[in-house]
């Protein structure tokens, strides 16, 4: 699973997801892509599940680029813990995704195979997405 090697601070504020994505919303590497249509936190497990599903379907033919990286730690308090005594410990990492963000790119395969591979990856995502073709 993806996670930063080291961070400046162990814990972060939750923040809020307003507006659309102005960065990372164009296809850069491949020919076909999966684009987010809703804002969400996508966990490193979900990113890896989508990548594996695409890789398994496309086999050796295509190349896959993962365009998001989970750089935000999410803290969770232990079960049945009383309020107070500080913030919980970091449990997992998420990537903050806004509408318009490209999640995955794929190239080197036909459009029908790319559509099928990306639809499998899209089913692993917790948000609505769309298939995009470069150009």
Swiss-Prot record:
Main location: plastid
GO molecular-function term, one example from the UniProt record: structural constituent of ribosome
Keywords: Chloroplast, Plastid, Ribonucleoprotein, Ribosomal protein
A Pfam family reported for this protein in Swiss-Prot or TrEMBL: Ribosomal_L16
Domain of life: Eukaryota
CDD domains to which the protein is assigned, alphabetical: Ribosomal_L16_L10e
Biological process according to GO: mitochondrial translation
Cellular component GO terms, alphabetical: chloroplast; mitochondrial large ribosomal subunit
PROSITE patterns: RIBOSOMAL_L16_1, RIBOSOMAL_L16_2
InterPro entries the UniProt entry points to: Ribosomal_uL16 (IPR047873), Ribosomal_uL16_bact-type (IPR000114), Ribosomal_uL16_CS (IPR020798), Ribosomal_uL16_dom (IPR016180), Ribosomal_uL16_sf (IPR036920)
UniProt xrefs under Gene3D superfamilies: Ribosomal protein L10e/L16
Subcellular location: Plastid, Chloroplast
Subunit record text: Part of the 50S ribosomal subunit.
Stated family: Belongs to the universal ribosomal protein uL16 family.
Protein name: Large ribosomal subunit protein uL16c
């Amino acid at each position: 699973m993806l996670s930063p090697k080291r961070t400046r601070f162990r814990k972060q504020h939750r923040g809020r997801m307003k507006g659309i994505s102005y960065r990372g919303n164009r296809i850069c590497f491949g020919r076909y892509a999966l684009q987010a249509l809703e804002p969400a936190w996508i966990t490193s497990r979900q990113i890896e599940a989508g990548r594996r599903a695409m890789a398994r379907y496309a086999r050796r033919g295509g190349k896959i680029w993962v365009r998001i990286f989970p750089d935000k730690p999410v803290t969770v308090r232990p079960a049945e813990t009383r309020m107070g005594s500080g913030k919980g410990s970091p449990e997992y990492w998420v990537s903050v995704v806004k509408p318009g963000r490209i999640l995955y790119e794929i190239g080197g395969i036909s459009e029908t195979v790319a559509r099928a591979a990306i639809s499998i990856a899209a089913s692993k995502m917790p948000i609505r997405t769309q298939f995009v073709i470069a150009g």
